[in-house]
Every structure is written in C-alpha cells, then in structure tokens.
Amino acid sequence: MSGPIPNPGILDIAPYVGGEHSAPGVTRLLRLASNEGALGPSPRAVEAFRAVGPEIHRYPDGGSTRLREAIGHRFGLDPARVLCFNGSDEVLHLLAQAYAGPGGEVLYSRHGFLVYPIAARAAGATPVAAPERNLTTDVDALLARVSERTRIVYVANPNNPTGSYLPADALARLHAGLPPHVLLVIDAAYAEYVTANDYADGTALVARFDNVVMTRTFSKLFGLGGMRLGWAYCPPAVADALHRVRSPFNVSVAAQAAGVAALEDLEFQERSRALNEQSRTAFTGRVRALGLVVHPSVCNFVLVDFAATGRPAEEARQFLKARGILVRQMGAYGLPDCLRITMGLPAEMEEVADALGDWLKG
C-alpha cells in the first residue's frame, strides 16, 4: 500500500451503518429504524431553535454553561460535573481516547452498542466482548474478563438493541468487582423511558466513586436526534481529562438553545414517556398474538425474533420496507434472526402489526 497508512486497528473497524432513511418507489415512510422519539421535538425546543437563527454567525459558549445548569437543575446534579457533547457518541469516543489506548482492553456486553468496539479500536485498544445471559448484560461474565490490561467497561443500561436492563444492585455489584483503575462507563441513553422501580441510571455511583461516568442523550425522549446533543456526568478528574481532549466549540448554538428548552418542557417529556408505554404494550401484545417472539423491553423499541418462523428476518424487513416501513436488521449485533422496531404513534404501530401479519400469511 502506498501513501499514508492508518494507525493499527483502524482498518479493522467495521463502519457504523445507521438506520435507513428511504425506500425506492415509496413516498410515505414510517421511519422506525433509529429509535427516534415518536412525538418529534418539544414545541418549545423548536421555538428556541428558530429564535437563535440571527445568532448563528457567533461561536457558541464553549462550556455550554446554560445547558449544563439546566441539566443540573432538571436531574439534581452538580453542573460542574456535567459536560456536553456533539451527541453521546462523542463522549464515548473521547473516553476511549483518554483512558484506553494501545495495549489496553475495553470490555462490553456481546450485544451492546456497536460504537463501543469502534471507539476502542479507534483509540488503539482491543475490544473484548462478554457473553450475555438471556439477552441481558451478564455481570459475572464481564468481571471474569477483567484483566490487568482492562481500562474501560462500557455498559448500556438499558441496552440497545435488546431493550433489557441491569437492576441497581447488579450495576453496583459490577462496579464493586472492578479494580479502581478501570473506568465504568454507564451509557444511559434510554434512561428516561424506564419506569421499573429497581432501575438506577448510575448517577449515585458517579457521585460516590472516582471511576464511574454516566452518559445521556437528547436524541430519544427529547426528540433532538438531528441536533446531535449528549452529555456526561463525571467525577472531577474525568471531567478535567475530557475538557482537555474535546473540541473547543463542540455543541452548536442551536443545540444548546434547543436542549435548554427541551429540558424545561416537563409536560412534553411525560407525554412522550406515557405514549411510549402505551404503544410498546399494545404492539408487543399484538405481535405476540401473531406467534412471534418479542423480547421484553423498557425502551422505545422492541426486539422481535423471527427464528421460530423458519424464515429469515431480513425477508420480513424487506417486506415491511416495500410497504414503506423502515425497521432495523440486527445481524451486525450478532442477532441475525431479529428486527429492532422503534415505537411510533399507536396508529403507526397498528400498521406495522398488520403488515407483519400479512407477511406471516405469505
């Protein structure tokens, strides 16, 4: 190979492929492949976005001060330990850059978010996957793979794409089993959807220990996926390290304004959460009545398993796509028999269930 050569491991990265946005020959689409909020953004966020239009020639506040204060107020956190990013993907990468590296290992759950191994390899570290138990993070399996080379453990809680979660006591046990030098990163992107009493998003662990970080996003319940806005709650030393490696103006003027407004719209947040519960419960019941396996989920999506049909999940995906329904095939996550289906509005989910019923008859 002539010319510049990428660092070791870069060409081993399988590029991340997001959910589809179009279907040839189809004009009306139901986009249920990327776990976007069914209600879209808060009207207050849209208004705030429009209001900053005349100011987009100005650089944003590099510290995202108002947004960090709004996050602190909304979730009862110290704003000094909150950092904002261009989507939570950015902080997942920066943590690997700052704390992993050549010779280090990064642990994650077998069916965890694909960004974890990508971030590890991009930093020159080695990703190590631990098996799951019943499509749920297995604490014992993760701890069994901790070595002197382990630098980071990524845990999605709740997990994408399985929809499962670790109860608070299991998450605490995972942390207790890690050496102090290993950083536990709790990716709580779907935390706002969880109503289970035994769930914890990780903020209590961050408050008590120096080796835990929790990350969150505005892309799901808050409906700001197109803004690319995420944040992290960190120990002071980790916050200092991230400040040193992040881009100076990594969160746009528009994203900061929309984020503050979205946080203040509590009625919209509750309506989004309630609608998701309604849609997920009804859709799960209908699809199970068709004879398909729907794995339990606490998120704004469900994982549907087609193995028992004796037909490929990809066939079902293509059938849905031809009807303008875009869902996500899970082969890249090691779940080739499954489709992940985002929860839309109730009428939309009825349409999806009807289409699956038609496919099963074919």
UniProtKB/Swiss-Prot annotation:
Cofactor(s) the record lists: pyridoxal 5'-phosphate
Modified residues (N6-(pyridoxal phosphate)lysine): K220
Gene Ontology process terms (BP): L-histidine biosynthetic process
EC number: 2.6.1.9
Keyword Amino-acid biosynthesis: yes
Pathway this chain belongs to: Amino-acid biosynthesis; L-histidine biosynthesis; L-histidine from 5-phospho-alpha-D-ribose 1-diphosphate: step 7/9
Keywords recorded for this protein, A-Z: Amino-acid biosynthesis, Aminotransferase, Histidine biosynthesis, Pyridoxal phosphate, Transferase
Superkingdom field: Bacteria
InterPro entries for this protein: Aminotransferase_I/II_large, HisP_aminotrans, HistidinolP_aminotransfase, PyrdxlP-dep_Trfase, PyrdxlP-dep_Trfase_major, PyrdxlP-dep_Trfase_small
Catalytic activity annotation: L-histidinol phosphate + 2-oxoglutarate = 3-(imidazol-4-yl)-2-oxopropyl phosphate + L-glutamate
Gene Ontology terms for molecular function: histidinol-phosphate transaminase activity; pyridoxal phosphate binding
Enzyme class of the recorded protein, top EC level: transferase
Pfam families reported for this sequence: Aminotran_1_2
Family of the protein in this entry: Belongs to the class-II pyridoxal-phosphate-dependent aminotransferase family. Histidinol-phosphate aminotransferase subfamily.
Subunit (UniProt): Homodimer.
Name under which the protein is recorded: Histidinol-phosphate aminotransferase
Source species of the chain: Rhodospirillum centenum (strain ATCC 51521 / SW)
Lineage, opening ranks: Bacteria, Pseudomonadati, Pseudomonadota, Alphaproteobacteria, Rhodospirillales
